[in-house]
Amino acid sequence: VKHLLGDVIMTSFAYPQGNVSIGAKRFLSRKFSVCRGTQAGINTKLLELSQLKCVNLDANFDKNSIDALIKETKVRNGWIIFNTHDVIDFPSPYGCTPELLYAVVAAVAASGIEILPIKHALGRAMFRPITR
């Protein structure tokens, strides 16, 4: 990939279709800071950096549950990785509409939760100040 992207340093990896194995996790954890699977959920406390959880914005996503998801994230002091395959007016079963993406981003922003790239969120999670 370096011949295409130059000096870009890739720090995260997403398992294709969520195909994860112990061998893949072992190999990829040496190549990337974090890897994301397709297991649904909020990332909290002890993070499995070789298989972070995510929330899929796809045909099955219930936009009415976003407030509950945000509330749970705040209560658990966690962070969410949202992913989708395409953003278009008539998305594939794995994508979402621009309106849904906007609604989710607006709800998260309005809640006061920071919106960050994965590597920045990881930095916050790994190097947050110790509180007493």
State where each predicted segment sits.
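Acidic carboxylate-rich catalytic motifs and surrounding loops in phosphoryl-/glycosyl-chemistry enzymes
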Residues: 15-17, 117-123
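Catalytic grooves of carbohydrate-active enzymes
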Residues: 4, 56-120
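Active-site-proximal flexible loops/turns
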Residues: 21-23, 124-127
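Positions that flank functional sites
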Residues: 42-43, 88, 123
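Catalytic domains of cell-wall/extracellular-matrix polysaccharide-remodeling enzymes
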Residues: 1-68, 72, 96, 100
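Accessory recognition modules or surfaces
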Residues: 80, 125-132
